[in-house]
């Protein structure tokens, strides 16, 4: 089994660098365009199942890419709960808390790194159970921070390593296993975009 990880398209807050967890923003016009552009690439993968975060931006991306009717909402794909840091930029947070790093410190009133790691592990366990009953590729439409968390936990790294796995909007990653070593998980593709992104590199 492979997992195709798709980050949602651009929103006004992804463009401005504001942390967007539970705030239910829709896509910008550019976000809609880049989500539609996912369709030709994703159609070739013949997904056996499509899971999507409950957030509007992820659901819109999934629908515009052509998979809305076959998708199922999975709350474990939600973005990191930023708690009191919702809507703030990293530079704003560091003025309050110098040296803050979400991957080490988490968010007061929201999720800790241990919380997010446990959620990613829970999702991976369920995906592995699916693998026992079906082959093929599962698509997951999610978010920047949680997508990075899922990738590092997939290959057995500590959650803090997620800070090195930036995901641009409407980008694609493929999580799989080594060809002759099915017990060895791999990252086959990461942060693949149709064209150079208009948004800055995400601040992880």
Predicted regions and their residues:
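Generic beta-sheet signal
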Residues: 3, 133-145
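Active-site-proximal alpha-helix that buttresses catalytic centers in soluble enzyme cores
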Residues: 3-69, 96, 111-114
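Active-site metal-binding loops of divalent metal-dependent hydrolases
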Residues: 9, 144, 193
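Glycine-rich phosphate-binding loop signature in dinucleotide/nucleotide-binding domains
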Residues: 43-46, 127-136
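Conserved histidine-centered catalytic loops in small-molecule metabolism enzymes
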Residues: 45-76, 176-204
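Short beta-strand scaffold positions
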Residues: 52-53, 118, 141-142
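Phosphate-handling substructures
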Residues: 65-122, 202-204
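Acidic, low-complexity terminal tails and accessory targeting/binding regions
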Residues: 81-91, 133-136, 152-204
């Amino acid at each position: 089994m492979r997992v195709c990880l798709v980050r949602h398209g651009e929103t006004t807050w992804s463009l401005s660098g504001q942390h967007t967890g539970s705030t239910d923003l829709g896509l910008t016009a550019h976000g809609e365009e880049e989500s539609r552009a996912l369709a030709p690439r994703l159609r070739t993968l013949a997904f056996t199942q499509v899971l999507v975060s409950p957030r509007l931006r992820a659901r819109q991306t999934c629908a515009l890419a052509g998979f809305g009717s076959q998708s199922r909402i999975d709350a474990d794909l939600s973005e990191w709960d930023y708690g009191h840091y919702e809507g703030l930029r990293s530079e704003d947070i560091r003025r309050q808390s110098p040296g803050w790093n979400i991957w080490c410190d988490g968010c007061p009133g929201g999720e800790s790194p241990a919380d997010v790691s446990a959620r990613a592990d829970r999702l991976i366990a369920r995906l592995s159970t699916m693998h026992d009953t079906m082959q093929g590729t599962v698509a997951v439409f999610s978010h920047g921070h949680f997508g990075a968390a899922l990738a590092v936990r997939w290959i057995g790294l500590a959650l803090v390593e997620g800070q090195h796995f930036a995901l641009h909007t409407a980008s694609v990653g493929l999580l799989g296993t080594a060809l002759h070593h099915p017990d060895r998980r791999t990252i086959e593709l990461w942060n693949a975009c149709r064209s150079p992104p208009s948004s800055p590199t995400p601040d992880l």
